[in-house]
């Protein structure tokens, strides 16, 4: 028997809105430690890594590990039925069951909605994610990254990210011209942590990425006030959003090779 209860159904709704345009279906791997999801987009350029730890749920019960293969499009539609303040309970009987149940309850418990989604068989691929010693780690307001991607996508399709101790520069060029946006580390100690930019740089790094993917990642902005970009030459950038005390949503994007 698997059952997990979230105080905010809106959290899972925001997660699905962030990934459903990249991946059509995926396995939610449930274990006593929590729920995880790893999935590659159709072009094999982006890897999604979602971790929701058991201690972040109001209640969490998982007798044994099981995988719930779900259509993310269908799940996203059902989650839209949840009110912003509703709680969410997820139930699955065992590996023999072909459905998973989602229950939404209003704060006053005067409205309860339950939906069953049929499970689908998805080949379960596990990707090895190695911890790297990155050349540059940039922590910045997530809304700022979203704005940068939105502004620069008007001009070009490939963004060059250059990072060093002095700042991080986002550059694009296209048929109509070029553009650059530079973000410097926050020096004012009075700026709240969730509004400050912090750059840890061991050595300068310059990488090119498809802007459309970075723009897609920023759909996760409502999940967290901050985003972390971890970069090193020749390996995927990691764009990570911390989800309160529940876990994190990370995107790995391979650089464009000229």
Swiss-Prot record:
<dbReference type="GO" id="GO:0019985">
    <property type="term" value="P:translesion synthesis"/>
</dbReference>
<dbReference type="GO" id="GO:0006272">
    <property type="term" value="P:leading strand elongation"/>
</dbReference>
<dbReference type="GO" id="GO:0006298">
    <property type="term" value="P:mismatch repair"/>
</dbReference>
<dbReference type="InterPro" id="IPR046938">
    <property type="entry name" value="DNA_clamp_sf"/>
</dbReference>
<dbReference type="GO" id="GO:0005634">
    <property type="term" value="C:nucleus"/>
</dbReference>
<dbReference type="GO" id="GO:0043626">
    <property type="term" value="C:PCNA complex"/>
</dbReference>
<protein>
    <recommendedName>
        <fullName>Proliferating cell nuclear antigen</fullName>
    </recommendedName>
</protein>
<dbReference type="Pfam" id="PF02747">
    <property type="entry name" value="PCNA_C"/>
</dbReference>
<dbReference type="GO" id="GO:0030337">
    <property type="term" value="F:DNA polymerase processivity factor activity"/>
</dbReference>
<keyword id="KW-0539">Nucleus</keyword>
<dbReference type="InterPro" id="IPR022649">
    <property type="entry name" value="Pr_cel_nuc_antig_C"/>
</dbReference>
<comment type="function">
    <text>This protein is an auxiliary protein of DNA polymerase delta and is involved in the control of eukaryotic DNA replication by increasing the polymerase's processibility during elongation of the leading strand.</text>
</comment>
<keyword id="KW-0235">DNA replication</keyword>
<comment type="similarity">
    <text>Belongs to the PCNA family.</text>
</comment>
<dbReference type="GO" id="GO:0003677">
    <property type="term" value="F:DNA binding"/>
</dbReference>
<dbReference type="GO" id="GO:0006275">
    <property type="term" value="P:regulation of DNA replication"/>
</dbReference>
<feature type="DNA-binding region">
    <location>
        <begin position="61"/>
        <end position="80"/>
    </location>
</feature>
<comment type="subunit">
    <text>Homotrimer. Forms a complex with activator 1 heteropentamer in the presence of ATP.</text>
</comment>
<dbReference type="Pfam" id="PF00705">
    <property type="entry name" value="PCNA_N"/>
</dbReference>
<dbReference type="InterPro" id="IPR000730">
    <property type="entry name" value="Pr_cel_nuc_antig"/>
</dbReference>
<dbReference type="InterPro" id="IPR022648">
    <property type="entry name" value="Pr_cel_nuc_antig_N"/>
</dbReference>
<dbReference type="GO" id="GO:0006273">
    <property type="term" value="P:lagging strand elongation"/>
</dbReference>
<keyword id="KW-0238">DNA-binding</keyword>
């Amino acid at each position: 028997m698997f059952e997990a209860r979230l105080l905010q159904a809106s959290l899972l709704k925001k997660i699905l809105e962030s990934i459903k345009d990249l991946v059509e279906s995926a396995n939610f791997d449930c274990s006593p430690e929590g729920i995880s999801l790893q999935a590659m987009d159709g072009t094999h350029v982006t890897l999604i890594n979602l971790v929701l730890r058991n201690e972040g749920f109001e209640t969490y019960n998982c007798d044994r590990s099981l995988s719930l293969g779900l259509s993310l499009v269908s799940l996203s539609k059902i989650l839209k039925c949840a009110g912003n303040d509703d709680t969410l309970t997820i139930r699955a009987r065992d590996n023999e069951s072909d459905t998973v149940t989602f229950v939404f309850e209003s704060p006053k418990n005067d409205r309860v909605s339950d939906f069953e989604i049929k499970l689908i068989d998805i080949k379960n691929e596990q990707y090895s994610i190695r911890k790297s010693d990155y050349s540059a780690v940039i922590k910045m307001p997530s809304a700022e990254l979203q704005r940068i991607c939105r502004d620069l996508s008007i001009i070009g399709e490939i963004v060059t990210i250059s990072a060093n101790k002095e700042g991080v520069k986002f550059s694009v060029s296209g048929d109509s011209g070029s553009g650059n946006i530079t973000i410097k580390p926050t020096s004012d100690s009075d700026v709240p942590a969730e509004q400050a930019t912090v750059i840890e740089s061991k050595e300068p790094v310059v990488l090119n990425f498809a802007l459309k993917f970075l723009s897609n990642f920023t759909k996760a902005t409502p999940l967290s006030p901050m985003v972390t970009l971890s970069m090193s030459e020749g390996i995927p950038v990691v764009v990570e959003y911390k989800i309160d005390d529940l876990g994190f949503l990370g995107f790995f994007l391979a650089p464009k090779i000229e």
